[in-house]
């Protein structure tokens, strides 16, 4: 609808037209500030230009039946859509059902490689991982809905010092809790009940002869064993959030291509040796300084794995590569992009979205840390506490790059302070009315819309505006727009519901048709957020 209106106006005015929503709904459905943009060109007041353009638009043959009014107001041009136009769009939307707001694959469609979560398999997923996980999953859903091809991948850091430290931590826990030895732990190690659980499980699963081998052999085996268990648990944690990946990329496998990548970097004159280390000349591409790839002891830095992995990704020739990283990784963006340029790729095809910190409260106090994981709040604990859908909604309700703080008890309230409950409640009210109505759904669907007042028309317009919300949320990576859209639409519906009778009036079928449109838009919006909307609210909800 938004795209159609924009296209018609641009054809009439032969200028690029920005379409906005007026701040005051009494000013209409859409507005454009084009007169301000043309004021310098025509050397006239925006107020005069707006009046002239409003007349031109309202009298043009292409707008007949499209608008009820085209009005110049303080330099803006405000548009009120006709009921006939809204009805045609409503009929089409209700026929499309769950595909309303979607787009078919076209030449504008992109091929997107989306990497997210990629947490080290050294422990269970905590709440900090959940935000990027939920965002990435919903972004993929929206992209596919808009006709794009998306591959979702999890990069598994299954080698290096952290995996060895995991094995060492399990070995020390084994000695302390299974062999009952007195153990001195290093300053840095993985702690928490999950490490003890792995140690005890290893005692049952692995051959007793293993524990008679030399310590490095034992640590090596336990590293792989613990890593595999953690990866299984991570997949279970993701499943609890409704998240599934298309593929998991192993760092160990990726590193098999190390020599070929280093050879190409050397040919590109991207490397040099200094202080017994091998450096990447990343400062040539806007990095603050050059970066070490190979340390003095010939071991590899974390960046090296990223460089090789991104080479693997870019060989697959996607239109766009999106990484979702924690905000603490912001310093890695320039260095990874530099490596891509040296390897002959267009680094502008890589977009890195940063997920800011999450702070959970319960009764206005910090949420209790998990004993099992040490100093972390586990995803599983919060999902068990408030439910998957509520957690997904709250994580998506703020921009990814802003800090998020919320009290989980808000998500248990049954009133308007709990946004997800209020949206479910709107849909539940609609389905309850449909059940009570003497009219079948087919009768309602076939009813023409003829007698709607301004408030009813505006509610219908809001429900029909879902496609624009979907498109904007994807283009701006602002998935909070979907949450805001659903909250606003639900609020408008509740206002409409409370304003007067819907059933047992001469307009019942027309009003129920509006309700069906509202329900469809709420359902489709929630589906893209990975949430199943409720048709009935029970006491336990």
Curated annotation (Swiss-Prot):
Its main location: cytoplasm. InterPro entries: aa-tRNA-synth_I_CS, Arg-tRNA-ligase, Arg-tRNA-synth_N, Arg-tRNA-synth_N_sf, ArgRS_core, DALR_anticod-bd, Rossmann-like_a/b/a_fold, tRNAsynth_Ia_anticodon-bd. It comes from the Bacteria. PROSITE patterns: AA_TRNA_LIGASE_I. Its EC number is 6.1.1.19. SMART domains: Arg_tRNA_synt_N, DALR_1. GO terms for cellular component: cytoplasm. One of its GO terms (molecular function) is ATP binding. It is found in: Cytoplasm. A motif ('HIGH' region) lies at residues 119-129. Pfam families: Arg_tRNA_synt_N, DALR_1, tRNA-synt_1d. One of its GO terms (biological process) is arginyl-tRNA aminoacylation. It is an enzyme of class 6 (ligase). The keyword Ribosomal protein does not apply. It catalyses: tRNA(Arg) + L-arginine + ATP = L-arginyl-tRNA(Arg) + AMP + diphosphate. Keywords: Aminoacyl-tRNA synthetase, ATP-binding, Cytoplasm, Ligase, Nucleotide-binding, Protein biosynthesis. Monomer. Belongs to the class-I aminoacyl-tRNA synthetase family. PANTHER family: ARGININE--TRNA LIGASE, CYTOPLASMIC, ARGINYL-TRNA SYNTHETASE. This is Arginine--tRNA ligase.
């Amino acid at each position: 609808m938004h795209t159609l209106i924009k296209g018609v106006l641009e054809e009439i005015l032969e200028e690029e037209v920005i379409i906005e929503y007026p701040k005051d709904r009494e000013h209409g459905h859409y507005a454009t500030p084009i007169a301000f943009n043309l004021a310098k060109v025509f050397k006239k007041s925006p107020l005069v230009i707006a009046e002239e353009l409003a007349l031109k638009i309202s009298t043009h043959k292409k707008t007949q039946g499209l608008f009820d009014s085209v009005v110049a107001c303080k330099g803006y041009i405000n548009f009120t859509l006709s009921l006939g136009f809204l009805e045609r769009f409503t009929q089409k939307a209700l026929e499309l059902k769950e595909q309303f707001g979607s787009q078919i694959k076209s030449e504008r469609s992109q091929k997107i490689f989306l990497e997210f979560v990629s947490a080290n398999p050294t422990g269970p997923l905590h709440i900090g991982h959940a935000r990027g996980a939920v965002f990435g999953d919903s972004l993929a859903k929206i992209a596919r809905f808009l006709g794009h091809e998306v591959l979702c991948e999890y990069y598994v850091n299954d080698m290096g010092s952290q995996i060895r430290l995991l094995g060492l931590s399990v070995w020390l826990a084994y000695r302390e809790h299974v062999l009952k030895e007195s153990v001195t732990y290093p300053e840095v190690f993985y702690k928490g009940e999950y490490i003890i659980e792995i140690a005890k499980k290893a005692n049952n699963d692995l051959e007793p002869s293993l524990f008679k081998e030399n310590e490095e052999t034992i640590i090596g085996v336990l590293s792989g064993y613990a890593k595999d268990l953690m990866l299984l648990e991570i997949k279970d944690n993701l499943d609890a959030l409704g998240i599934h990946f298309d593929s998991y990329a192993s760092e160990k496998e990726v590193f098999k291509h190390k020599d070929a990548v280093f050879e190409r970097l050397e040919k590109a004159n991207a490397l040099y040796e200094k202080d017994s280390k091998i450096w990447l000349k990343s400062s040539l591409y806007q990095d603050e300084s050059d970066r070490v790839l190979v340390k003095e002891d010939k071991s590899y830095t974390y960046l090296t794995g990223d460089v090789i992995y991104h080479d693997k990704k870019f060989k697959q020739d996607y239109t766009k590569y999106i990484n979702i990283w924690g905000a603490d990784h912001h310093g890695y963006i320039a260095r990874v992009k530099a490596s891509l340029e040296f390897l002959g790729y267009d680094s502008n095809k890589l977009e890195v979205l940063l997920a800011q910190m999450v702070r959970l409260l319960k009764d206005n106090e910090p949420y209790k840390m998990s004993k099992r994981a040490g100093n972390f709040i586990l995803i599983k604990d919060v999902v068990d506490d408030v439910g998957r859908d509520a957690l997904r909604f709250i994580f998506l309700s703020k921009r990814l790059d802003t800090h998020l703080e919320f009290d989980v008890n808000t998500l248990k309230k049954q009133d308007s302070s709990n946004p997800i409950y209020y949206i479910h409640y709107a849909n539940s009210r609609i389905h309850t009315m449909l059940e009570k109505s003497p009219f079948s759904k087919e009768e309602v669907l076939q009813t023409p819309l003829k007698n709607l007042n301004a408030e009813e028309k505006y509610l219908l317009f809001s429900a029909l505006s879902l496609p624009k919300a979907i498109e904007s949320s994807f283009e701006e990576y602002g998935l909070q727009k979907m949450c805001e859209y659903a909250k606003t639409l639900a609020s408008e519906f509740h206002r409409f519901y409370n304003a007067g009778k819907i059933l047992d009036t001469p307009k019942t079928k027309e009003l129920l048709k509006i309700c069906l449109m509202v329900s469809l838009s709420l359902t489709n919006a929630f589906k893209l957020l990975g949430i199943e909307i409720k048709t009935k609210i029970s006491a336990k909800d």
